[in-house]
Regions:
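Bacterial N-terminal signal peptides
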Residues: 15-25
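Sec/Tat signal peptide C-region and signal peptidase I cleavage site
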Residues: 28-32
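Gly/Gly-Pro-rich "capping" loops immediately C-terminal to redox-active cysteine motifs
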Residues: 39, 53-82, 93-98, 138, ...
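C-terminal capping alpha-helices of c-type cytochrome domains
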Residues: 97-122, 197-225
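Intrinsic, low-complexity N-terminal interaction/targeting segments
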Residues: 43-46, 106, 115, 120-123, ...
């Protein structure tokens, strides 16, 4: 902005373009995401994520994740990962490949703010409402899970990390297991940090942690939507 103002004093003819560029730089991030546009693009998402209790059968039967209330930055990064093949799920990859970067940003903005009409969101305490057993507490400490996902697992240190408190236990378990998979073109997630963490645990331990995290209150929810709008 300082450069633009100096330009204005030196040459009035250059002032307008310079100021326009400066303002565009300041407002570009805000306009990159359009929640209203995302709502209009969500038709392909509703069939799974807009139905309470909807289950997917690949790679095993589990509830699809709740995404309403999730961090926009994380949703967008997840869609990009499916598109690039870093996350391997045939259905999600096909959907992601059909989306532009703008589509992903709009959908992410929509789902981050998506809530049930007329219902105010409850404030989630900064400390876990339910304390884990000694065994589960030791497992969580071993992986330093709270250092990224937050002490209450609902307030991660960065929007690129997911809120996981209250997420479906069976989904969390399947998602965690997927980081153990290597060399499979249809199943698995490429994330070096998560892969290193998850490989420390047995499947029984992953299930125990998933059940505890799912028992916690959080912002995630399923907002039922009609396919016909």
């Amino acid at each position: 902005m300082t450069h633009a103002l100096n330009l204005k004093l030196a040459n009035p003819k250059l002032a307008a373009p310079a100021l326009a560029l400066a303002l565009a730089a300041l407002t570009g991030t805000a306009s990159a995401q359009d929640a209203k546009a995302g709502e209009q693009k969500a038709a392909m998402c509703i069939g799974c994520h807009g139905l309470p209790g909807f289950q997917h059968s690949f790679p095993e039967v589990h509830k699809v994740p709740m995404i309403s209330g999730q961090n926009a930055k994380y949703i967008e990064a997840s869609l990009q990962a499916y598109k690039k093949g870093d996350r391997k799920h045939p259905t999600m990859r096909a959907i992601a490949e059909s989306l532009s970067d703008k589509d992903m940003a709009d959908l992410a903005a929509f789902y981050e703010t998506h809530q049930r009409p007329g219902r105010a969101l409850k404030t989630v305490a900064d400390t876990p409402a339910v304390q884990p057993s000694a065994e589960v507490a030791a497992l969580l400490a071993k992986g330093a899970c709270a250092s990224c996902h937050g002490v209450n697992f609902n307030k991660p240190i960065d929007g690129a990390y997911p809120k996981i408190a209250g997420q479906h236990a069976d989904y969390l378990y399947v998602a965690l297991k997927s980081y153990k998979v290597e060399g499979n073109p249809l199943i698995g997630r490429n994330n070096a940090i998560m892969a290193t963490q998850v490989k420390q645990y047995t499947l029984a331990e992953l299930r125990a942690m998933s059940r505890y995290i799912a028992s916690l209150p959080g912002d995630l929810r399923v907002v039922e939507q009609s396919k016909f709008r």
